[in-house]
Amino acid sequence: MREELNQGLIDFLKASPTPFHATASLVQRLEAAGYVRLDERETWHTEANGRYYVTRNDSSIVAIKMGRNSPLHDGIRLVGAHTDSPCLRVKPQPELQRQGFWQLGVEVYGGALLAPWFDRDLSLAGRVTFRRDGKVESQLIDFKAPIAIIPNLAIHLNREANQGWAINAQTELPPILAQFAGDERVDFRAVLTDQLAREHGLNADVVLDYELSFYDTQSAAVIGLHGDFIAGARLDNLLSCYAGLQALLNADTEETCVLVCNDHEEVGSCSACGADGPMLEQTLRRLLPEGDEFVRTIQKSLLVSADNAHGVHPNYAEKHDANHGPKLNAGPVIKVNSNQRYATNSETAGFFRHLCMAEEVPVQSFVVRSDMGCGSTIGPITASNLGVRTVDIGLPTFAMHSIRELCGSHDLAHLVKVLSAFYASRELP
């Protein structure tokens, strides 16, 4: 089971270079399992024990397995994650021609570790909006091949490189895509038009706009002398999206189960499809009883907010509280912060720990050092907007927000097992 899950994750990561592609990958797997799309612009007709999903902006998704038991009586079981990861996004007018090289200007999305982006074989993917036969359409594209690189400056020309180097995102991050002689000009939108024709057989009259991100073409892999680790891009937080999906597909229960994967977590979640937007609540209000009964249902429900945790790094162990250093391959981590950067409380933490113990899954705790700031997740945002009890958890990870992150190869199976138990739980606290 472990090897199968890990390979499934690797395949999912490869198919999901952007939030748009991640959502499409989730949709593909849900539809294969019998889930039916609900269109937000139409009237919904649902039934007990039905399986449905809703997307917004092509980058966020809510999947629902309706239970035969009344949500008003038993509550609902929610797992939340996010589809986006820090990256380099192409600017609207990106063309740069310097010293005979054709480059694209980029904007840093989220809190990316920038140095690892240098000297990597990069490709480009995302969503393109275009006009065809007088109609405006959108399509996902993925060049897949390594078409760009951001070469480092040789140490001979930057002797201070190993003593700390502040990277200028405006001048030092534009990737190189080609070299030209003379005054030859390249129209980036024409390149996208060609890609639409090549990848989808679409003859666009004009490319109107796009949302495109560079990504590392190196596939994720199980690595280590004994295969102890998984290295790959976008583990934060596609790892949790995939674990939540597998648990939902495993769910054979009479209870109502929900998986929500939001976009824009890495930039604050404030969007129509982000966790700080109305998507989840609007979806639930259309599926659950109204008014007083809706509030009662939510108060009987529980959200597991799944987002990667910081594993204790052997070279930087002092960056962790001495008593709270989560280890790779030692199970999911319950994340706690007294300032509500995480939504965990003693009741929700206790219930998650109870699930882990019942499933014989190891479990750990994380709290940030008292002299350091703490990151956050969709947990507190969803809890405050929806009023649902929440526990923040995640799998320990190294190099979070790097172009290539690292997690334990045993932990995915641990997380899927406990999330499956959560979906199957007959009673919530």
Curated annotation (Swiss-Prot):
It holds the Pfam family Peptidase_M18. Its cofactor is Zn(2+). Its EC number is 3.4.11.-. Keywords: Aminopeptidase, Hydrolase, Metal-binding, Metalloprotease, Protease, Zinc. Transmembrane segments: none annotated. One of its GO terms (cellular component) is cytoplasm. CDD domains: M18_DAP. It is an enzyme of class 3 (hydrolase). GO terms for biological process: proteolysis. It comes from the Bacteria. Zn(2+) binds at H82, H156, H401. One of its GO terms (molecular function) is aminopeptidase activity. Coiled coil: none annotated. Belongs to the peptidase M18 family. PANTHER family: ASPARTYL AMINOPEPTIDASE (PTHR28570:SF3). HAMAP family: Aminopeptidase_M18_2. This is Probable M18 family aminopeptidase 2. The gene is apeB.
